[in-house]
């Protein structure tokens, strides 16, 4: 039984093909440029020719792609975008047009074909992934499921901050079901306000199997907890993904330092006790440690992050999480995790001392942590897949079979 998992970030897209016949460590994996970086590089390469560009397809992750598109417009190079593609820049299309970008209907795409360089926008390109695996002799024609993670701010109403809108959504989901997997959905159950998740589903309508989509933030945290030292899933109930199944640590703080966003979840016996999200480019180690300490002592306020150009914070407890009881203070993952390896500097928060990180590497690979979170969430949403998936994910339960004997 195979499940394809794709964790799409700002810098990279991380791909893991789960095969129930193989130990997790022998599963095939890829770390490739993210879709937004692919668009960014293509536009940068084409920029000197000043050729008009038409961007069509779906809403996708912004950041680098949006920066490159806006650079074209500022340079006076004609830029045309279909409405769905334009939402990559902003959900309010009049703001896209204010940048000097021309919005065109889908029926106009063909007539512009000979006059522009065309570029299709989408986060998830299953045919390309399938071709890549096929070139190495691996077929994706027998998948039981596909799971894709993207970071979605949601479609905020005009005049509403997309950062605030996202945190209102996080709060709503956590209060509805306090579990990291509450942020995963079958493609048919995606909340209407989560337009980037829906765009992933729209671009994958021809899949021959169920599609699960999830937010990247909880996927990374959920996956990190499969590190054998954390022992999260050593439970008699294979389907139990609730933090109360923790036998060795009843609470922990997990921080994911991504290329574009940094977040931390405080997890306890009853689930998520607090969370904050910031932009990685706006923080350094002292600031990050200060926020984590506030998350731990339950003094963290939404404004502490939001007013500093971050997304925000949520607290669901007033109990103090005490550091120093274990051999590490915070679990760290993410491609920019080296921030915690830098020489400590005095904290501006006046609390003294540096936090002791544990660099989680589930099944020996930190970069695939989000894929393992996707895998676990998929098994929860599709119960028929749960037993083999959780049987594989439980640390120390490998079959010890060589790939040629599987």
Regions found by a protein language model. Give the residues of each.
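A charged amphipathic helix-loop-strand protein-protein interaction module that recurs
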Residues: 290-300
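Nucleotide/phosphate-binding catalytic cleft detector across ATP-hydrolyzing
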Residues: 1-4, 10, 18-240, 247-252, ...
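Short acidic-glycine loop/turn motifs at beta-strand connectors
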Residues: 19-21, 267-271
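Short beta-strand scaffold segments in enzyme catalytic cores
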Residues: 13-17, 262-266
